Amino acid sequence: MKAAVVEEWGRAPIYTDHPEPVARDGGVVATVEASALTNLTKGLVSGKHYASGELTLPVIPGADGVARLEDGTRVYTGALKPYGMMAERTLVDPDGAVVIPDDVDSVTAAAIPNPGVSAWMSLEHAAAIRPGDNVLVLGATGVTGSTAVQLAKSAFGAGRVVVAGRDTTRLDWLRTVGADDAIAIGTDDLRARVARLHAERPFDAVLDYLWGEPAEQVLDALGTSELAARYHHTRYAQIGSMAGLTMTLPAGILRSAAITISGVGLGSIPPEVIGRIRAQALPKMFAMVAAGELQLGVEARSLTEVERAWTAKEPSGTRIVLTP
């Protein structure tokens, strides 16, 4: 069969021949229809991701995707090691698959789960969003951030959602799908805007997809605002690091305000919670997509273009999906 194959850590995969998968240990061979080119997929084969050690080269990338089982059922699933989803066929566990409704196409269905499940875990588990909560989404213009904005309002009942990001066109669009206010990073004074909004109505939760300097400014605003003298608990969920892998956090910030910081990733959420969210929330999100209540930009490309797609800059707010 044809597949995308990574032969060296950190290098783009090549489109080449690969041995067919063989059914074993409860896994069945399925025909792949689509697999999203996500940051997780790229990170795992970079050799630098904290889960890269579980892989052995050469490897077929593709953490998850849409496949068709032998009986014709179309499902969202992950591939069983050592296979990935960026191939014509792969090995899957049918018991862990989620059936895709007929009114959601395979490309969209492949794009939704990664940002959707991540956003849902962040909202439910780390940020613990409750109806009426005041939420700040830092780095909201990306695929996962914009998904979180929509779910915060429509699925979790957030009372106010403030979005922050650099792409002003995307910020304007986010106002049409649930955002109540927007902060343009690089144009607005991020720290001052967050401090003022926090003083007017304290943030119950922050979803941070950036880290780095923007996170420093936000945490400084939360920790040194006029509210520092009054107790209000803010749940800070750290999800991404698009603006930097490190940041400086003065100890005084954590002592001057009730801020709880927790991470969202493969090792920070209990496996049973991840499994439950995939099983219960994905069908809800597929239904929301079909009803037009959850929107995500997608761009389909042939798997034959994997080398070019891998190194190309992803359009803002759009997820590239590869199809065999």
PLM feature spans:
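C-terminal hydrophobic helical "lid"/dimerization subdomain
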Residues: 1, 272-324
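Mid-domain Rossmann-like dinucleotide-binding core that forms the NAD(H)/NADP(H) cofactor-binding site
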Residues: 112-188
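N-terminal Rossmann-like NAD(P) cofactor-binding module of classical short-chain dehydrogenase/reductase
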Residues: 76, 206-207
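Glycine-rich phosphate-binding loop and adjacent beta-alpha segment
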Residues: 213-291, 324
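Glycine-rich beta-strand-centered segment in the early N-terminal region that forms part
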Residues: 20-37, 48-84
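Short amphipathic alpha-helix with an adjacent loop that forms part of the alpha/beta core around
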Residues: 189-201
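Short, glycine/polar-rich helix-capping loops at beta-to-alpha or helix-loop-helix junctions
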Residues: 86-87, 165-173, 246-251
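NAD(P)H dinucleotide-binding glycine-rich loop of Rossmann-like/cofactor-binding domains
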Residues: 61-64, 75-141
